[in-house]
């Protein structure tokens, strides 16, 4: 069987994610499928979201698209399979502080962290709570005058989790151990195909091919990819600020049973 790019039986795949939730890990896993290709890397700007609908069989794109019922219906009508990955927002907040300081220098908070908010604790509170930008900080490429905080910025993306038309997964389940990783990847395979016959392999052979394509060192955004590293970084004040801003968010998304963490 010729598995040339665009083979008509191949799925059209959108990887949608909360930023800093293992987007590139999931991309590597999916690119381990024979015949999957990625011509255009990302569709992160809002004006590009509808271009996702034009992807071809076998094509993979990734983005950070907020939940939208009409877009969900359009994906279904275009036979596009959405894989959605999310992560503990506390680990995302910590990761984002490091990412802004070390690599993402066009982020609106980079000049804030360079000149105004200097300690890690204060920077983490800024990512959690948001901040009004002042002076030259307003001259950012996004044209914003206030950074809203990671909760308010990303909550509309998290809301995809309960969409019944997609395959939703937690970053933690892809990395915590081999058994849970296998369960998640097999879930992806079952979501993408009803019948693997034309690939001339069974799902466990495909599972191993997908796992063998994982290489964190190839990811520009990769730092540690740890689970629960927030415990080493959050101060008591960070915890209080997070609870004030997010309410019962962690409980709803299965990361805590109550707010006594």
Describe the role of every protein-language-model region.
Residues 68-70, 174-177:
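A short acidic, often aromatic-flanked loop/helix-cap motif at beta-alpha or helix-coil junctions
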Residues 1-169, 245, 253-258:
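PAPS-dependent sulfotransferase catalytic domain
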Residues 74, 178-179:
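Short histidine-centered beta-strand/loop micro-motifs
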Residues 2-13, 79, 138-147, 151-162, ...:
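PAPS-dependent sulfotransferases, especially Golgi type II membrane carbohydrate sulfotransferases
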Residues 25-28, 179-183:
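Generic recognition of short, well-ordered alpha-helical segments
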């Amino acid at each position: 069987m010729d598995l040339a790019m665009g083979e008509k039986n191949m799925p059209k795949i959108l990887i949608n994610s909360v930023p800093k939730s293992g987007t590139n890990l999931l991309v590597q896993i999916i690119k381990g499928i024979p015949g999957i290709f990625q011509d255009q890397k990302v569709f992160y700007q809002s004006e590009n979201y509808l271009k996702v609908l034009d992807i071809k069989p076998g094509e993979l794109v990734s983005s950070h698209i907020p939940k939208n019922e009409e877009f969900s219906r359009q994906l279904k009508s275009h036979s596009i399979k959405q894989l959605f990955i999310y992560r503990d927002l506390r680990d995302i907040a910590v990761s984002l502080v490091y990412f802004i300081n070390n690599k993402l220098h066009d982020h609106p908070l980079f000049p804030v962290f360079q000149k105004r908010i200097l300690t890690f604790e204060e920077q983490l509170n800024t990512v959690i709570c948001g901040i009004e930008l002042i002076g030259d900080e307003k001259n950012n490429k996004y044209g914003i005058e206030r950074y809203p905080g990671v909760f308010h910025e990303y909550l509309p993306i998290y809301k995809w989790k309960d969409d019944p038309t997609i395959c939703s997964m937690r970053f933690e389940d892809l990395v915590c151990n081999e058994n849970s990783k296998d369960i998640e990847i097999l879930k992806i395979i079952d979501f993408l195909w009803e019948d693997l016959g034309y690939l001339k392999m069974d799902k466990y052979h495909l599972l191993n091919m997908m796992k063998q394509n994982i290489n964190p060192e190839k990811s520009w955004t990769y730092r540690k990819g740890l689970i629960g590293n927030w415990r080493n970084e959050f101060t008591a004040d960070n915890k209080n600020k997070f609870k004030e801003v997010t309410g019962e968010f962690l409980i709803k998304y299965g990361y805590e049973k109550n707010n006594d963490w």
